Amino acid sequence: MPFRSNNPITRDELLSRFFPQFHPVTTFNSGLSGGSFLIEHQGQRFVVRQPHDPDAPQSAFLRQYRALSQLPASIAPKPHLYLRDWMVVDYLPGAVKTYLPDTNELAGLLYYLHQQPRFGWRITLLPLLELYWQQSDPARRTVGWLRMLKRLRKAREPRPLRLSPLHMDVHAGNLVHSASGLKLIDWEYAGDGDIALELAAVWVENTEQHRQLVNDYATRAKIYPAQLWRQVRRWFPWLLMLKAGWFEYRWRQIGDQQFIRLADDTWRQLLIKQ
């Protein structure tokens, strides 16, 4: 149920107007992320979400709602309400673990997602890379960063192997191990793109695990594993630049030192993978 309003409302106004019988749950269970809280009424639970990035355009939050509206409930939470700065979705009961599931199980989830109808908007990385450069701390901008940005701009993004709907933020903290199988939360970066881009973006523990995930996916997708791995590798510089730039952007935005550490670590990875 989309609800359009140009006037932002508070949390209390949201609950009293749309969910008067619900109350916030003070003890949060697994499956929630930053900027979310849980409400409950007679055993029914919803997650109330706000945009993670307060500076992002409103259209990005609306796209997340639209993506959830067309995805099957077997892999994503069903949305119930959207309005400016707020979204209410189903709570997914289950465990959120600190490590990825078996690569074959994860490959099955991603392959199923990639068989769904496309969302209708493309993921393009270059505008994001340039935005993060422009919005980063000037003291953190380096000649090397600018050189790599120009190199990618000249090379252009790899041609998609297969174009599908992507989640684009697959890591252990966004996977809910439910009684009915794996499900994904936090769809804020979802869009249409290359399946190899999704596989390249998974937050794996090591190269061996990454290769096995790609091999398991290739088996399901009937693609030669070596061909798929080559395409995944083409996306590595783009993904590492995206991560590094995002960490730099978030550092300037909120000043949390963890983002400097994450950015520095990603820059080191980028130099290794060149």
Curated annotation (Swiss-Prot):
Q: Name one Pfam family in it.
A: APH
The protein's Enzyme Commission number: 2.7.1.89
Keyword terms: ATP-binding, Kinase, Nucleotide-binding, Transferase
> What superkingdom heads the lineage?
Bacteria
Give the GO biological process terms. thiamine diphosphate biosynthetic process; thiamine metabolic process
UniProt key word ATP-binding: yes
Functional pathway: Cofactor biosynthesis; thiamine diphosphate biosynthesis; thiamine phosphate from thiamine: step 1/1
Which GO terms of the molecular function aspect are on file?
Answer: ATP binding; thiamine kinase activity
Tell me what reaction this enzyme catalyses.
thiamine + ATP = thiamine phosphate + ADP + H(+)
Task: Check the record and name the NCBIfam families matching this protein.
Answer: PRK10271.1 (NF007620), ycfN_thiK (TIGR02721)
Function according to Swiss-Prot or TrEMBL: Catalyzes the ATP-dependent phosphorylation of thiamine to thiamine phosphate. Is involved in thiamine salvage.
Q: What is this protein called?
A: Thiamine kinase
